[in-house]
């Protein structure tokens, strides 16, 4: 069953710990320094509200269809990347409705690297951003759990869902 990261902006304090944890969780893909800091999520701020934004792992991901060389594919849990196939055309960047894909060249390397959330598939503990958030503003939920949370919020708000 597909899992998703949900964010509660009311709990986010904008500390960017999630961004740092993300970079640390992907050390083989970049050097850890201020010049090359490539988190796969970005904390967005609007007035007094902040919230991390990341790939939504769309079911019919427009980025997958936009890539002319198949560097992005649909996996069971996430939109998967294959940077070895990437030609740097940035079609996927343009196609992403959330602006959450970056194409990056690392210093001293001519290859292109696709940078997007992969739900930290390589980590047994799950996404580093979820684990590191000091206020638990991020949660990893299955689609079933997400439906349950949505129903609870509707009931709590007293809204008529119809």
Swiss-Prot record:
Domain of life: Bacteria
Residues that bind [4Fe-4S] cluster 4: 67, 86, 89, 92
Domain 4Fe-4S ferredoxin-type: residue ranges: 3-32, 45-77, 77-106, 110-143
Keyword Iron-sulfur in record: yes
GO molecular function annotations of the record: 4 iron, 4 sulfur cluster binding; metal ion binding
Sites where the protein binds [4Fe-4S] cluster 3: 55, 58, 63, 96
Binding residues annotated for [4Fe-4S] cluster 1, in chain numbering: 12, 15, 18, 133
Gene3D superfamilies with a match to the protein in the record: 3.30.70.20
Binding sites annotated in the UniProt record for [4Fe-4S] cluster 2: 22, 117, 120, 129
Entry keyword set: 4Fe-4S, Electron transport, Iron, Iron-sulfur, Metal-binding, Repeat, Transport
UniProt protein name: Putative electron transport protein YgfS
Organism: Escherichia coli (strain K12)
